[in-house]
UniProtKB/Swiss-Prot annotation:
Molecular function GO terms recorded: protein N-terminal-methionine acetyltransferase activity; protein-N-terminal amino-acid acetyltransferase activity
EC number(s) recorded for this UniProt protein: 2.3.1.254
Principal cellular location given in the protein's record: cytoplasm
This protein's UniProt keywords: Acyltransferase, Cytoplasm, Transferase
Role this protein plays: Catalytic subunit of the NatB N-terminal acetyltransferase, which catalyzes acetylation of the amino-terminal methionine residues of all proteins beginning with Met-Asp or Met-Glu and of some proteins beginning with Met-Asn, Met-Gln or Met-Met. NatB acetylates TPM1 protein and regulates tropomyocin-actin interactions, it is presumed to N-acetylate 15% of all yeast proteins.
Compartments reported by the entry: Cytoplasm
Protein name, entry field: N-terminal acetyltransferase B complex catalytic subunit NAT3
GO cellular component entries: cytoplasm; NatB complex
Quaternary structure and partners: Component of the N-terminal acetyltransferase B (NatB) complex, which is composed of NAT3 and MDM20.
GO process annotations (BP): ERAD pathway; mitochondrion inheritance; regulation of actin cytoskeleton organization
Misc: Present with 639 molecules/cell in log phase SD medium.
Matching Pfam families: Acetyltransf_1 (PF00583)
Domain N-acetyltransferase: residue ranges: 2-172
Gene name as annotated: NAT3
Length: 195
């Protein structure tokens, strides 16, 4: 049985089963603490009750999000949504995303849209987000470039391993103004992503 609960500082010691995975982005401790302090209601975990006595409530995944922007750009940004390999393929990522949507579509947040960035070559994640109602708003060329790659010098050179799709889902108060049907054809540089 899955429960959704607020993420607590001590949970950082219980997420190895989630974070020690090549598909999961890891951050410095202060980054996690910043989210717990500033956006505590948008940083939550899924826990599983198991029969194993060493894990009373096994953390199966978590959602890290924040609110940002002003006026028409007021939105929730998903920084990380991740599920432990053992608990994948049982719709936990969908449950975490749906929980976030329910929370931020109403006051005190009442955002216009939810957005996230996903590597252009991550077809599994893209399909999941599309199933949840997200669509590509634009392609951010060179979003995942390393220091060795340098900053992109043209929008014409795309690389599915280095570029990100900025995916969005419009919320009730937005009425689809923050999404576009032809998002894959719109390209921008990483510095153009400002809220």
């Amino acid at each position: 049985m899955t429960t959704i609960q607020p993420f607590e500082p001590v949970d950082l010691f219980k997420t190895n089963n989630v974070n020690l995975d090549i598909l999961t982005e890891n951050f410095p401790l202060e980054f996690y603490f910043e989210y717990m302090i500033i956006w505590p209601d948008l940083f939550f975990k899924s826990s599983e009750m198991t029969v194993d006595p060493t894990f009373k409530h096994n953390i199966s995944g978590y959602m890290m999000a924040k609110t940002e922007g002003k006026t028409t750009e007021w939105h929730t940004h998903i920084t990380a949504v991740t599920v432990a390999p053992r608990f994948r393929r049982i719709s936990l990522a969908s449950k975490l995303c749906n929980t976030l949507e329910t929370m931020t579509d109403v006051m005190p947040h009442e955002v216009n849209f939810i957005d996230l960035f996903v590597k252009c070559n991550n077809q599994l994640a893209i399909k999941l987000y599309e199933k949840l109602g997200y669509s590509v708003y634009r392609r951010v060329v060179g979003y995942y470039n390393s220091a060795e790659d340098g900053y992109p010098d043209t929008l014409k050179k795309v690389d599915d391993n280095k570029d990100a799709f900025d995916m969005r889902k419009a919320m009730a108060r937005d009425r689809n103004r923050s999404v576009r049907p032809d998002g894959r054809s719109h390209k921008c540089y990483p510095h153009d992503v400002r809220f």
